[in-house]
Amino acid sequence: SDKKEENAMEKNLTTGSVFKNVILFSLPYLLSYFLQTLYGMADLFIIGQYDGVASTTAVSVGSQIMHMITVMIVGLAMGTTVSIAQAIGADNKKQASKAVGNTIVLFMGVAIVGMALLLMLVHPIVSVMSTPAEAVNGTVTYLTICFIGIPFITAYNIISAIFRGMGDSKSPMYFIVVACIANIVLDYLFMGALKLGPAGAALGTTISQAISVLVSVIVIIKRKSVVLSKKDFKPYREVMGKILYIGIPIAVQDGLIQVAFIVITIIANQRGLNDAAAVGIVEKIISFLFL
């Protein structure tokens, strides 16, 4: 039964049809990415129904920044996926556990430092974005709440990276489905019923990510999928080095693609509120095409 428990999460991609394995593994991964993009779109769609152009612009500018941060975390977490996959491929359980433990320590540090830095820089970020005056307060509020939620975004993405490294790309997809449904329900509650505007959009996003992390942690505990000892959390230079060596170039590459979108947003923001809102919505649609 232990073997069964292990196999519930760990899937050997080196046996059977390569093409079939690749398709079965990559489809849920693509779908997860697609749903993550849908996240910011839901906020925009729902605030557009209940609020004015200023609030829509605030959410569109704020979610653009959050999307950039998210794709960079996803890119960095790719270092974890590769490290774990290589250890499992080499049938080295100890190394896989070490990679998981070091990932948790490394990304906890990244999340806390990132959150503190971004909260300190929230006003300069909103200024650099040339946010239209009417949308400044809404954007600051949206980003402040979302920045507080960065540990949840990071936790979701490293848990997903660990699952994928073990050959399971379906579970992360289910976690993001939970987050998307919760986000839509909470958006209608906070923006529709409670009329909280951009703050409601940010609260919906942050709380739904926390729910998603909670669900994924429960799944890990129930399945006993990852067995870690104290020494796995001890930072190993070569383990963390490898995660960063693989993850940083991917994070930078994905971040630079988003910089191009942000430059367009800045130009649109300088043209006033209506242009800013319109471009923000169109850019969300273009993000899909970049998947």
Model-found features: residue ranges?
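Short alpha-helical transmembrane segments in multi-pass integral membrane proteins
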Residues: 1-26, 84-149, 193-248
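Signature of the first transmembrane helix
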Residues: 20-81, 85, 248-268
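Transmembrane alpha-helical core residues of multi-pass small-molecule transporters
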Residues: 63-66, 110, 178-182, 204-212, ...
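Structural signal for membrane-spanning alpha-helices in multi-pass inner-membrane proteins
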Residues: 118, 161, 187, 191, ...
